[in-house]
Amino acid sequence: MSIEINNESAVEVDEPLIQRLATYALDTLHVHPDAELAIVMVDEGAMEQLHVQWMDEPGPTDVLSFPMDELRPGTEDRPTPAGLLGDIVVCPQVAAEQAVTAGHSTMEEILLLTAHGILHLLGFDHAEPDEEREMFGLQRDILIGFAMSERGR
């Protein structure tokens, strides 16, 4: 798995932890080991520019996903083909604000947003209630499974 993490924000993040979560999520979703993923942390100003440019929405947001090869989750017998999964852009400052509301750490929120972004790259969405149930259920399962795997480290 080629996972590149680039922190362009002023906030320190635990890059090895993000790397482990991304690897866990991609393995869980049976994505080909040669798939490529980029995760970029940006400050609020950069995120606001991206949010306006790509979503036509004002202000910064927490996470944006930019799929490349439109890969979908695989199965144990048939993993996703190798390819460019795409880019996930996370704003740690927005994540910090959301973490306070959610009652957990900023890093936990960044991990949640990373899992959320990966699911979007693999074609999941939450525009409709059924889609939301499926996507958020997978997101929860990934985060719980990852937390359990980290306890065993």
From Swiss-Prot:
Role description: Single strand-specific metallo-endoribonuclease involved in late-stage 70S ribosome quality control and in maturation of the 3' terminus of the 16S rRNA.
Gene3D superfamilies documented for this protein: Metalloproteases ('zincins'), catalytic domain
CC per GO annotation: cytoplasm
The EC number(s) this enzyme carries: 3.1.-.-
Keywords associated with the record: Cytoplasm, Endonuclease, Hydrolase, Metal-binding, Nuclease, Ribosome biogenesis, rRNA processing, Zinc
Cofactor binding summary note: Binds 1 zinc ion.
GO MF annotation terms: metalloendopeptidase activity; RNA endonuclease activity; zinc ion binding
Name used for this protein in its record: Endoribonuclease YbeY
Organism lineage: Bacteria, Bacillati, Actinomycetota, Actinomycetes, Micrococcales
Compartment(s) of residence: Cytoplasm
Keyword Metal-binding: yes
Record-listed Zn(2+) binding positions: H116, H120, H126
Family as reported in the entry's similarity comment: Belongs to the endoribonuclease YbeY family.
One of the GO biological process terms: rRNA processing
Enzyme class at the top of the EC tree: hydrolase
Cofactor(s), by name: Zn(2+)
